[in-house]
Amino acid sequence: MTAEAILLHLRYLLVGPYPNGPLSGAALTVWMALLACVAATVVGVGCAVLLDRLEAMPNLRWLARALRGMLATLRAIPVLMLMFWAYFLIPMALGVAVPETATVVTALAAVGAAYIAQSMEAGLRAVGAGQRNAALALGMRPTQALLTIVLPQAWRIMLPSLANQWVSTVKDTSLAYIVGVVELSTAAGQVNSRTVAYPAEVFGAVAVLYFLLCSGIEALPNWLRATSTPQVEMSTWKRFLRWRARPAADAVT
């Protein structure tokens, strides 16, 4: 195989026929994984916070059980099956044509959110109850104590677990072939069909690309933990104590 042919096939693995055609290959894998990871993290953390608050309200615990049941159902459904359902059910429910990539991102985000919610709920419980009680004793509202004291610490505790879920999401994008999305693995199959004599080289290059993507994600928690140091968490207490002391100081003056 000539150098020109190698570069041509490598370009197809990276971006597909873009800009003369739709974006595909590794670029589409990264784009779908990024959207799915962001959506899954936001929804998953939101569900964990909601479950925490619902459990504190005896008359709404049935709603917490219903939400847990829904999340458990999403975790039990195979990702491939969920993509297939999303591909057919979302356009039927909305009554409009929905791009295949949107259905894949929706399915990946739903599954990821279910796992992240479970992880974050465990992280919230891992934070000592004494810290929440101390915040309440200082006059914080329960939701305020949860969001400003407990959640930042739970986030740092569960970062490795979140990174594992993000890596799984990247790898699960390879299942998008079921709805005809030409992501990295599908693009590799197309390249291999053109160069039948070089399957090891083609799929070896794909393995390297997946390794680089997943390694970058696994390194992300270390950077995030460095940017959310305990000093940052303690500053929340300092700001709150200053806010509590300000009315008393104003009254004296």
Regions found by a protein language model. Give the residues of each.
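Transmembrane alpha-helices and adjacent helix-loop boundaries
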Residues: 1-253
